[in-house]
Structures are given as C-alpha cells and as structure tokens.
C-alpha cells in the first residue's frame, strides 16, 4: 500500500511539474506577444510622428498668406485712390455741365471747357490702366483667396487637434482683420452712392449736350450770315462733343465693371465675415480645450512621477520574484533528489526484506542442521539493518512531509507571484500608454510653442513691413506693369501648387486612412488576444481548483496513511516483543541443544563401546556355541533348548512371563520323556552348566559395570529404566521358577539352572538391543 501511494504521489508530482512547465511556456509566449505588440506600437508611433512632422510643415506654406494679405491691403489703398480720382472726375463733369449751360457766353468759357475736355481725354488712359490693373489684381486675388480658404480648413482641423494655443496669440491679428473688414464694408457702402452720383452727372451731361446741339442748330439758322467763323466753332464743338460722348460711353463701361467688382468684393466680404465668425467660435473652443489640456498636463505630470516610482518599485519586485523562483527551482531539485533517495532506500528495504525471508528460511534450515551460531550473528546484523532501514524510512517520511508543506507554500507563493506579475504587466502597459500619450502631447505643445513664437516674430515683421510698405507704395505703382507679367507666371505656378497641394492632401488622407485601418486591426488583434488571455486565465483557474481538490485528496490520503502508519508501528512493536521472546526461547533451546550435543557425543562413545562389547560377546557366544556343539556331539541337545533362543524371546514383560511358563511346562514335559533316555549324562550336563553359569555371571557383571557409568551421564533414562525393569522381571521369574521347582520335585536342578542361565542371557541381549533402538529413536525425534 505504501509503495502504491508513493507511486501515486510521484505521478502527481510529475503532473504538477508538467503543469508548471506549461505555465512557464504560457508566460514566455505572453511576454513574446507583449514584446511584439510593443514593437508594433513603436512602429505606429513612428508613423504618427512622421505625420505630425508633415502637419508641422504645413504652416510653412501658410506663410504665403501674409503676402496675399499685404497685396489685399495694397489693392484696398489703390481702390481708395481710384475713388478720389473718380470724385475729381465728377467735379470736372459738373464744371462741364456749367459750361454747356453757359455755352452762349464768352469764348473764354469755351477755352476753359476745351481745357476741361482735354483733361478727361488726358486722364482716360490713366484711368483705363488703373482699372485694368485693378481687374488683374482682383483676378489674382480670387484664386489666392480660394487657395487660402482651402488651406485654412485643414489648418484649422490640425490646429483644433494638435495646435490649440494659436487662438490665444492670433486674437490680436484677427481683431485687426475685423477692423479692416469693417473699413472695407464702409468703403463698399460708399461706392454705390458715388456711382449713383456719377450716373446722374452723366445724364445731366447728356442733356446738356443735347441742348447744346439744339442751340447749335438754332445758331446755324441764325448765323448763316457768318458762315466762316460760326462754322468753325460748330465743327470744333461737334468734334469735342463726339469725343465727350465716347469718353462718357467708356466711363459707363468702366462704372459697370466697377459695380460688378464691388458686388464680387461684397460677396467675398460676407464669406470672410462668416469665416471670421467660425474662427472666433473655434478660438473659443480651442481656449476651452487649452484649459482642459493644461489640467490634463498637470495631472499627467503627476501621474508620470507616480508611475515612474511605481515602475521602479515593480522592477524591484520582479527581481525579488525572480530570486524566489530560483529558490523554488532549487527546492524542487532537492525534492527530486530526496525522492530518488526515497526510492533507493525503498529498494534497499525491499532487498532487506527479501534477505530477511531468505535468512529466516536459512534459520529454519539451520535449526534442523544445528548451525545456530552463524544464524544468530546474521540475524543480529539483519535486525540492525532493519532498524536502520526503519529509522531511515521514518526520517525520509518526515523529510517528505516537510517538503510537501514547503511545496504547498511555494505553490501559494508562485500563484501570488503570477498574480503580481499580471498586475505589474497591466500597470506597465498603462504606464506605457500614458507615457506615450503624454510624450505626444508634450511634443504637440512644444511644436505649438515654437509655432506661436514664429508667429509672434512674423507679426512683428509684418508690422515693420507695413510701415515700410507705406513708404514703398509710390514705388509699387511703377512696378505694376512688371508684376502683371509675373502674375501670369504666378497663376501657372499657383495652379501647379494647387494641384500638388491637392495631391499631397489626398495622399495624406490615404495615409490617415491606412493608419486608421492599421489601428483598428491592431485594436481588434489586441481584443482577440485579451479574450484569449482571459480564456487561458479561466482554464488556469479551473486547473488550480482541480489542483486544490487533488491536494485535499492528498491530505485525506496522508491522514489515512498516518493512521495506517500508527497501526504498523504498533504491529512492529508487537513483532519486536515476539522477537525478544523468541530470542529467549532460542537461547534456551541453544543451550539445550549444546547440552544434547554433548550427551549425543557421550552416547555415541557409549554406543561404540557397546558395539565393541557386542562383538566381544558374539565371539564369546560363538565360542560357547562351538563348545556346546562339541558337547552336543557327545550329548544330544534337547528340543527346549532350540525353542529358548535369544532371537525368539518376546520383548514385553507379560509375554516373557507367559513364554517362561510355556517353556517351563514344555521343558518339564520333555524332561519327563527324555529323562528315561539320558540318565547317564547328568554329570556332564552339570559340568557344562556350571561353565555356562560362570560365563553368564561374568558377562552380566561386565554389562552392569558398563551400564552403571551410563546412568551417571545425562542420558534420557528410558533404556536404563527398562534394563532395571527387565532385571527385576528376571528376578521375579527366577523366584517363580524356584517356587515351581520346589513344587515339582520331579524336575532336576540341572534343568532349572539351564533355564535360569538361558533367561539371563536373553535378558541381557534384549536390554542391549532396546537401549540401541531407544537411542536411534531419540536422534530421529531431535532431527
């Protein structure tokens, strides 16, 4: 049972090791995935930084706006100058009206009117050039304003997202622009009134011309008498009037074109107003966002400081955890070594048990073969080995239990460490996200600061340039013709730039879409990975619960094992007590065996002596038989002698008595029949019987002398007792025969002596055989 339980524990240990390896591999894969995600994030960050740099380069293109604004200011001033010139022309037309009304007056007035008419003729090419230049400038400004609007829209979106501080420093410039727009509106409201005045004046001029023509016709009728001087004046006046009509027609065309331009400028002003209102709203939003961003910056700085401290603390914890993991691995290795030692000791114990069984068998065999000394020494050694093995088993079991407790604690520490690692990884991810966001915000804010500083510098430069431009206005009027040629080039360049800008804008949109697509894909991948990690966490939790259940089972099994161990210890104690008792019995048996060995040796010596004596007796008996044969040749032997042989005598007492009586009766009967046939041989028989009695007495004395020292030895005593009993029986038989002989006087004393001698010899030989058989039986029983 203990071996099976140990195997179960070892299998559970192997399973737990495999689970630990799987967890370690899962952690490695998670760390690799985190590294890959961090690399992808760095790549996306680098791409975003490139895009931000491209967006930062866009304000460089917006610097051309300032040049267009300067050109607009110049055009506004030129418009004001043209308006002053138009006022002058209106005054001149008023003078012409007065001249036409007073056409009948002196020729001096005509001369003045000619001068005045000549003045507008001289002013016409100037006005035409100015109007054409104005048209060209407005045509130049229209695409520039369109480009400016197109540029302002993405710039505003960029400013709202990444440059929220521009509104604070552009407030002054926007206020100046608002003032300029109001002045333009006032000028535009003034321009239509002036145009109406010009039209009225032109209508008056037309009426005056018609009146002058009618007056000229009447003067032709009246002045027919003076054809020479009057006709010249008329022709001159008619030519002047035609020229004035042409000039008026040209002026009307110019006025219509000016009205169209004014309408176009009004529409542009309305668009600019709407754009300014939108910009103001956006500025307000940007201010609010700036405040929020500043607060977030402060919070983020605080968070950065706290997170850096936490990050350092987490790194220290990670190092400590790594050290604990190393210690845990070392403890696991030591546990493995101890388990191997346990297995080796168990194998040694099994071998020792097998040896014990073999030795027990040998002990039994040694008891049979009487080799107890060597068995006792080996048994003592084996007992010592068993004690050492039991002690080693107890120590190893204690170490195993301690290591199991340590392992449980280590597993708990590992679980806590895994949880701490997960929390630290989450915190690291949050820290990286917050740091990246804060770095991007800081970069954006630094870029905004740089841009605002550049704008301040530009604004100061613009102020200085405005002062210089006021001085250079006179020079610019001369350079207008050169600028016209350059304007065509600029238009072409603008078209090219617009196309390039649109292409870049489209490319940027495509890049942004790609970045968005990548970001969405990365977010989806992260979500999938997060779900996978959550599933793995659930599986691990389920496994941990299973491990806890297994640990509970193991504890229950340990309790049962402890109970079984106690029972086994009690059994071992009982067995030791039995072993002690067996030792005492074995020692007593050994002492007896030694004693019996000594007795056996003595008995063997006695048996050798007896065999020698038996051989000696057989020789004597042969010699007696030989002598008897010689005597029988001389004297025949009776039948009763053949019946009274030693081999045919019964061994027991009763049978001996019965046999003796039967022999006695048969001998008496035979003697009665044979007494008549052998009366003469009595004397010879007496002599032979005396010889036999002497020999038998000698033999009896020798046998008794040899048996008496045997009685003093430590023999079992059965043979001696039986020998004495047989002697007593022989004495009783002799006494009975004596009684019978006394009763039957017919029997001769010779027959009695022969029977007594034969019986004594028979008893001696039977006693010797019985002692020899008893010794063999004792040896067999001992074996």
UniProtKB/Swiss-Prot annotation:
The keyword Coiled coil applies. Residues 1-26, 101-191, 209-231, 731-755 are annotated as: Disordered. Expressed in brain, kidney, pancreas, placenta, liver, thymus and prostate. Residues 1-22, 131-191 have a biased composition (Basic and acidic residues). Pfam families: DUF4686. Residues 22-98, 165-497, 527-622 form a coiled coil. Keywords: Coiled coil. It comes from the Eukaryota. Residues 106-115 have a biased composition (Polar residues). Belongs to the prefoldin subunit beta family. This is Coiled-coil domain-containing protein 30. The gene is CCDC30.
């Amino acid at each position: 049972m203990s071996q099976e339980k140990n195997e179960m524990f070892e299998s559970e240990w192997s399973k737990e090791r495999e689970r630990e390896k799987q967890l370690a591999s899962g952690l490695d894969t998670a760390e690799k995935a985190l590294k890959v995600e961090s690399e992808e994030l760095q790549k996306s960050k680098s791409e975003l930084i490139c895009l931000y740099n491209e967006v930062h380069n866009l304000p460089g293109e917006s610097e051309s706006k300032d040049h267009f604004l300067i050109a607009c200011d110049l055009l506004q001033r030129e418009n004001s100058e043209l308006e002053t010139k138009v006022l002058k022309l209106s005054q001149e037309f008023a003078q012409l009206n007065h001249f036409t009304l007073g056409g009948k007056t002196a020729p001096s007035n005509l001369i003045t009117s000619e001068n005045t008419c000549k003045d507008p003729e001289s002013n016409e090419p100037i006005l035409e050039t100015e109007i054409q230049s104005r048209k060209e400038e407005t045509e130049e400004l229209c695409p520039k304003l369109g480009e400016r609007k197109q540029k302002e829209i993405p710039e505003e979106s960029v400013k709202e997202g990444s440059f929220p501080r521009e509104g604070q420093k552009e407030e002054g410039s926007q206020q100046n622009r608002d003032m300029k727009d109001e002045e333009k509106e006032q000028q535009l409201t003034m321009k239509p009134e002036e145009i109406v005045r010009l039209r009225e004046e032109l209508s008056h001029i037309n009426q005056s011309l018609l009146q002058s023509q009618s007056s000229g016709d009447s003067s032709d009728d009246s002045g027919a008498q003076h054809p020479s001087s009057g006709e010249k004046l008329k022709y001159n006046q008619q030519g002047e009037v035609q020229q004035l009509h042409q000039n008026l027609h040209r002026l009307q065309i110019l006025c219509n074109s000016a009205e169209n331009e004014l309408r176009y400028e009004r529409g542009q002003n309305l668009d600019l107003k709407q754009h300014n209102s939108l910009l103001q709203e956006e500025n307000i939003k940007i201010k609010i966002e700036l405040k929020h961003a500043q607060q977030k910056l402060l919070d983020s700085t605080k968070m950065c400081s706290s997170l850096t401290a936490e990050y350092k603390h987490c790194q220290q914890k990670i190092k400590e955890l790594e050290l604990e993991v190393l210690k845990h691995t070392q403890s696991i290795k030591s546990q493995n070594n101890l388990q191997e030692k346990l297995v080796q000791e168990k194998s040694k114990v099994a071998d020792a048990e097998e040896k014990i069984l073999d030795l027990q068998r040998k002990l039994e065999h040694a008891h049979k073969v009487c080799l107890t000394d060597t068995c006792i020494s080996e048994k003592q050694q084996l007992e010592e080995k068993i004690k050492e093995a039991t002690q080693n088993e107890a120590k190893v079991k204690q170490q195993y239990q301690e290591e199991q407790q340590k392992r449980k604690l280590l597993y708990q520490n590992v679980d806590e460490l895994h949880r701490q690692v997960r929390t630290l990884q989450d915190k690291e991810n949050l820290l990286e996200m917050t740091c990246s966001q804060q770095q991007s915000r800081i970069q954006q804010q630094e870029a905004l600061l740089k841009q605002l500083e550049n704008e301040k510098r530009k604004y100061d430069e613009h102020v200085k340039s405005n002062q210089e431009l006021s001085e250079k206005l006179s020079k610019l009027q001369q350079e207008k013709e050169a600028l016209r040629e350059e304007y065509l080039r600029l238009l072409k360049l603008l078209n090219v730039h617009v196309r390039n800008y649109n292409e870049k804008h489209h490319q940027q949109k495509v890049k942004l879409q790609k970045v968005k697509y990548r970001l969405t894909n990365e977010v989806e991948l992260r979500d999938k990975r997060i779900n996978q990690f959550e599933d793995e966490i659930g599986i691990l939790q389920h496994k941990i619960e299973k491990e806890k259940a297994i640990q509970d089972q193991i504890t229950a099994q340990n309790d049962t094992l402890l109970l079984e161990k106690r029972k086994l210890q009690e059994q071992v104690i009982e067995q030791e007590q039995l072993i002690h008792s067996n030792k005492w019995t074995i020692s007593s048996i050994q002492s007896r065996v030694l004693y019996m060995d000594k007795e056996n040796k003595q008995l063997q010596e006695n048996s050798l002596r007896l065999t020698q004596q038996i051989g000696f007796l057989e020789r004597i008996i042969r010699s007696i038989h030989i002598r008897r044969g010689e005597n029988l040749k001389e004297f025949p032997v009776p039948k009763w002698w053949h019946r009274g042989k030693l081999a045919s005598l019964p061994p027991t007492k009763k049978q001996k008595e019965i046999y003796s009586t039967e022999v006695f009766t048969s001998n008496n009967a035979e003697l009665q029949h044979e007494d008549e046939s052998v009366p003469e041989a009595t004397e010879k028989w007496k002599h032979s019987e005396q010889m036999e009695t002497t020999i038998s007495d000698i033999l009896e004395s020798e046998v008794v002398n040899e048996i008496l020292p045997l009685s003093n030895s430590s023999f079992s005593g059965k043979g001696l007792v039986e020998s004495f009993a047989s002697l007593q029986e022989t004495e009783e038989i002799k006494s009975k025969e004596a009684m019978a002989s006394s009763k039957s006087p017919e029997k001769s004393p010779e027959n009695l002596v022969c029977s007594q001698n034969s019986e004594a010899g028979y008893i001696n030989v039977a006693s010797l055989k019985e002692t020899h058989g008893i010794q063999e039986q004792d040896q067999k029983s001992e074996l």
